[in-house]
């Protein structure tokens, strides 16, 4: 037997027991000849005492940190002055037996050391030994376990869908897998199980879920990985409200399982409201600083920059913030919004009851009216922008609002809401056509589509759950009629031949009795990161890739042999 107890298990009530522990050596101290070993495993830490007269004392001189050892001994209570607040801080083990199970070379760092992320990912097996990292993975497990528990108790079936499937690129690039048996043909790794879960609804499995790996070959950011995990859900005979209620209850349940209480009812705002107030379709409202329309205050202004914008049919917006402001800071903010195509920002501050600004002599009356309307307090600042493209201005001010918030506003707690009534389509400059904003299987508002509404204004039966400024889940009611699905394919520029080639199997399935259905998918990585209080999802993934898609532990992706390429019928093209 390697152990009778774990390193986080023993308490004062175990005094006098003979126990066996196994684990890693966290540290060794020598106090007047008495050796103290802190032994660590996944469950915690326990102090082991080796007295000079112990038969195992000589062994202690030949062990170091991160050795794996087995210790047998008697549990005793520590002296009152030696008790620590840790769960096992009341006791220690007096060793009578000690065995070295595995030696350790001098590691490049010790678990918990402050080292670069590159080092942590290269030696991930050392990094995961850090209790903080270990606890992140335990938390992730608890979220997944609670998900299965909740959905199983609500009549959902966990059904696995294929990883090797057909390439139907709409949006991000597919990861392609060459077929050895059918040379020149390729599987794709799924970006989501979207079509399979809809086909399961057509099959009569009315409540499906899966905790599933998905793959997207895209340029990466801090919150993206080429492979990621979704909590995937689909339901038959549902309206949007049914899916939203189920999803909200699920997220409340799984967060409660790890000790986080979310609001009893999530707020709901439209996409248009989110963009107008926060400049983002995933707003973090904890920062405050709602954007407001200020056009009315400047309609008679002679200030050249604003006057020209308004003459072109543009508008003026801004937000109030309790932050320091100077010409230098204003210049920094102007440079920031220039990255979004704006010319810069205007600003004014209420100081000693007076308007302070580099443009006060031109716009003092306008600034005073704004200050009065929005009840500005001493020291508050208004940041203002003007542009003839309202979408671009919303995006720029929204990004600036986030930058200011992260710099100056201390936030805590959880802001959870739904964003609904998304545009069904968005224009792709790159492709010169409309593309589906979510995916082309989302049900549009039929009254918009058939009522002559401009295509860019057609709404979708789509909904996103946002927590603390992160989109943690997105879903929609799906198209369950073949004629509507074919019309949508036509709108996004797919010919009948292309639609048949890519989605013929699905269009065929839509002919054989399809229940109205809808669903949602949550990012488990992001849900875990928010719960753990970390910004980067790599902190809650055991073996993540870098921002360039590399696994530093295994050095994947890597070259393969010519024999492997020949078997697949693949010839590599030299890059120019």
UniProtKB/Swiss-Prot annotation:
GO biological process, one term: aspartyl-tRNA aminoacylation
Name of a matching Pfam family: GAD
SUPFAM superfamilies: Class II aaRS and biotin synthetases (SSF55681), GAD domain-like (SSF55261), Nucleic acid-binding proteins (SSF50249)
Binding locations of ATP: 216-218, 225, 471, 523-526
Predominant location: cytoplasm
GO cellular component, one term: cytoplasm
Top EC class for this record: ligase
Lineage: superkingdom: Bacteria
Signal sequence, start to end: none
Residues reported in the UniProt entry to bind L-aspartate: 170, 216, 438, 478
UniProt keyword list: Aminoacyl-tRNA synthetase, ATP-binding, Cytoplasm, Ligase, Nucleotide-binding, Protein biosynthesis
Aspartate: annotated span: 194-197
CDD domains: AspRS_core, EcAspRS_like_N
EC number: 6.1.1.12
Catalytic reaction(s) noted: tRNA(Asp) + L-aspartate + ATP = L-aspartyl-tRNA(Asp) + AMP + diphosphate
Function description: Catalyzes the attachment of L-aspartate to tRNA(Asp) in a two-step reaction: L-aspartate is first activated by ATP to form Asp-AMP and then transferred to the acceptor end of tRNA(Asp).
PANTHER family per UniProt: ASPARTATE--TRNA LIGASE, MITOCHONDRIAL, ASPARTYL/LYSYL-TRNA SYNTHETASE
Family affiliation: Belongs to the class-II aminoacyl-tRNA synthetase family. Type 1 subfamily.
HAMAP family the UniProt entry points to: Asp_tRNA_synth_type1
Subunit structure of this chain's protein: Homodimer.
Protein name in UniProt: Aspartate--tRNA ligase
Organism: Fervidobacterium nodosum (strain ATCC 35602 / DSM 5306 / Rt17-B1)
Gene transcribed to yield this protein: aspS
